[in-house]
C-alpha cells in the first residue's frame, strides 16, 4: 500500500477499480481541520484526467505497471504490429487502443508499451522527440530562410503541422510528441 504522504509525480495507483497515474499532487495543511492531498490523476485506461482530494495519511493500492520497449514493424488493416526488442515476440494492438498516438506512429518507431499486471495493455509512451518524414508541403521560394514565416506540412503519418518555409517534401524533421510542434531539421538523414 502507498501512503498519500508518499505520492510522487508519475506513480501509478489503483483507486475506485481504475488505474491512475499521478500527474500533480499538493500536500495541504490548513490551520483548522486535518491535512489533505490534492491530486490530478490520469486514468490509464481512458486517458481522462480528474482532480481528486485524498485525506492525508490514508493508504491506496499501488498499480503494477511495466513498460516494455517495442518497435512498430508494420500495420495490418486496423492492427498495429509491434515487436519486443528483447525477445522478438510480436504483439498486435488494435488502432482504437492507440487513440491519440496514431498521428505519431510510423514503421520502425521505438515506443514503450505500458502493461497493467503484465497482461492488460493500458497505453504507450512515445519518445519526447521523433524524426519523421515530410510527405507534402508547398515548395519554398528562394530566400525563405530569412523570415520566421510558417507553412503547413503533412507528415508521413498524416499529421499536419506548421514548419518553416525552407522545409521541403521528403526531408526528415524532428518534432515534439508532447506538443506536436516542429523543433528542427533532422541532419542525420
UniProtKB/Swiss-Prot annotation:
GO terms for biological process: peptide biosynthetic process. InterPro entries: Elong-fact-P_C, NA-bd_OB-fold, Rib_uL2_dom2, Transl_elong_fac_P/YeiP, Transl_elong_KOW-like, Transl_elong_P/YeiP_cen, Transl_elong_P/YeiP_CS, Transl_elongation_fac_P. One of its GO terms (cellular component) is cytoplasm. Its main location: cytoplasm. The keyword Nucleotide-binding does not apply. The keyword Protein biosynthesis applies. It is found in: Cytoplasm. SUPFAM superfamilies: Nucleic acid-binding proteins, Translation proteins SH3-like domain. GO terms for molecular function: translation elongation factor activity. Pathway: Protein biosynthesis; polypeptide chain elongation. Keywords: Cytoplasm, Elongation factor, Protein biosynthesis. Gene3D superfamilies: 2.30.30.30, Nucleic acid-binding proteins. HAMAP family: EF_P. Involved in peptide bond synthesis. Stimulates efficient translation and peptide-bond synthesis on native or reconstituted 70S ribosomes in vitro. Probably functions indirectly by altering the affinity of the ribosome for aminoacyl-tRNA, thus increasing their reactivity as acceptors for peptidyl transferase. Belongs to the elongation factor P family. This is Elongation factor P. It comes from Aster yellows witches'-broom phytoplasma (strain AYWB). The lineage of its organism: Bacteria, Bacillati, Mycoplasmatota, Mollicutes, Acholeplasmatales.
Amino acid at each position: 500500500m502507498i501512503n498519500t504522504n508518499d505520492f510522487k509525480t508519475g506513480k501509478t495507483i489503483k483507486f475506485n477499480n481504475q488505474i491512475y497515474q499521478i500527474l500533480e499532487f499538493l500536500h495541504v495543511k490548513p490551520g483548522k481541520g486535518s491535512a489533505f492531498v490534492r491530486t490530478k490523476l490520469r486514468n490509464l485506461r481512458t486517458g481522462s484526467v480528474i482532480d481528486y482530494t485524498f485525506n492525508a495519511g490514508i493508504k491506496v493500492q499501488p498499480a503494477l505497471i511495466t513498460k516494455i520497449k517495442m518497435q512498430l514493424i508494420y500495420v495490418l488493416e486496423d492492427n498495429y504490429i509491434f515487436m519486443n526488442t528483447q525477445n522478438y515476440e510480436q504483439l498486435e494492438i488494435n488502432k482504437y487502443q492507440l487513440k491519440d498516438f496514431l498521428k505519431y506512429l510510423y514503421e520502425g518507431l521505438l515506443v514503450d508499451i505500458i502493461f497493467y499486471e503484465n497482461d492488460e495493455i493500458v497505453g504507450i509512451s512515445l519518445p519526447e522527440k521523433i524524426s519523421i518524414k515530410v510527405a507534402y508541403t508547398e515548395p519554398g521560394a528562394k530566400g525563405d530562410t530569412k523570415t520566421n514565416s510558417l507553412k503547413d506540412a503533412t507528415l508521413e503519418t498524416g499529421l499536419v503541422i506548421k514548419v518553416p518555409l525552407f522545409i521541403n517534401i521528403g526531408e526528415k524533421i524532428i518534432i515534439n510528441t508532447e506538443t506536436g510542434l516542429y523543433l528542427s531539421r533532422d541532419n542525420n538523414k
